[in-house]
C-alpha cells in the first residue's frame, strides 16, 4: 500500500519550547525575534536569547522577591508600585542599576535630614542635677 495515513513511519516527537529546554519562564523565542527585528546586529547566535532571557528572569525574580517583602511589611497581600519603589531604592545594587528610572505612583523614600531633627536636650536630667 501507499505510505499515506497515520500508520507507518516514525511518530513525530512533541515539540519542546526553547524556554522549557533552558528551564526558564521567560520566552526565549520571543526574545530571539525581538533581537533580530531590533537591528542590534546582523546575526544573532542561538545562545544569546537564552542568556538574555535568563538574566531578565533573574532580575525580575529579585525585584519581585524584595517587593513582596515590602508588601508583607506593610501588611498588604498585593504588590503595588510603591512596594516596587521601596524594594529598588532600598537595595544598593538595584538602585544603581535603575538609578535613572522613574516608577509611576512610586513615591519617595522617607528621609529626614539630621540637621532638621529637633536637638536632643538634657533638660530633665540636667535640671535634676543642678537643684
From Swiss-Prot:
InterPro entries assigned to the protein according to its UniProt record, in alphabetical order: Histone-fold (IPR009072), Histone_H2A (IPR002119), Histone_H2A/H2B/H3 (IPR007125), Histone_H2A_C (IPR032454), Histone_H2A_CS (IPR032458)
Pfam families the record matches: Histone (PF00125), Histone_H2A_C (PF16211)
Localization (cell): Nucleus; Chromosome
Processing after translation: Deiminated on Arg-4 in granulocytes upon calcium entry.
GO cellular component entries: chromosome, telomeric region; extracellular exosome; female germ cell nucleus; nucleosome; nucleus
Residue numbers bearing the Phosphothreonine modification: 121
PTM-bearing positions, type N-acetylserine: 2
Post-translational modification Citrulline, affected residues: 4
GO MF term list: DNA binding; protein heterodimerization activity; structural constituent of chromatin
Positions where Symmetric dimethylarginine occurs in the chain: 4
A Gene Ontology biological process term: heterochromatin formation
Keyword Cytoplasm: no
Start and end residues of each stretch annotated as Disordered: 1-23
UniProt keyword annotations, A-Z: Acetylation, Chromosome, Citrullination, DNA-binding, Hydroxylation, Isopeptide bond, Methylation, Nucleosome core, Nucleus, Phosphoprotein, Ubl conjugation
Modified residues (N6-glutaryllysine): 96, 119-120
Modified residues (N6-(2-hydroxyisobutyryl)lysine): 6, 10, 37, 75-76, 96, 119
Positions of post-translational N6-succinyllysine modification: 10, 96
UniProt entry tagged with the keyword Acetylation: yes
Comp. bias intervals (Basic residues): 7-19
The family this protein is said to belong to: Belongs to the histone H2A family.
Role according to the record: Core component of nucleosome. Nucleosomes wrap and compact DNA into chromatin, limiting DNA accessibility to the cellular machineries which require DNA as a template. Histones thereby play a central role in transcription regulation, DNA repair, DNA replication and chromosomal stability. DNA accessibility is regulated via a complex set of post-translational modifications of histones, also called histone code, and nucleosome remodeling.
Protein name per Swiss-Prot or TrEMBL: Histone H2A type 1-A
Organism of provenance: Homo sapiens (Human)
Lineage: Eukaryota, Metazoa, Chordata, Craniata, Vertebrata
Amino acid at each position: 500500500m501507499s505510505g499515506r495515513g497515520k500508520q507507518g513511519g516514525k511518530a513525530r516527537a512533541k515539540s519542546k519550547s526553547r524556554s522549557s529546554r533552558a528551564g526558564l519562564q521567560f520566552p526565549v523565542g520571543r526574545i530571539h525575534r525581538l533581537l533580530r527585528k531590533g537591528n542590534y546586529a546582523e546575526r544573532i547566535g542561538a545562545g544569546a536569547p537564552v542568556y538574555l532571557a535568563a538574566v531578565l528572569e533573574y532580575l525580575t525574580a529579585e525585584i519581585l522577591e524584595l517587593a513582596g517583602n515590602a508588601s508583607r511589611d506593610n501588611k498588604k497581600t498585593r504588590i503595588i508600585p510603591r512596594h516596587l519603589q521601596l524594594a529598588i531604592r532600598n537595595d544598593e545594587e538595584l538602585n544603581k542599576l535603575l538609578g535613572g528610572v522613574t516608577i509611576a505612583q512610586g513615591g519617595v523614600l522617607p528621609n529626614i535630614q539630621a540637621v532638621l531633627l529637633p536637638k536632643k536636650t538634657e533638660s530633665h536630667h540636667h535640671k535634676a542635677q543642678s537643684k
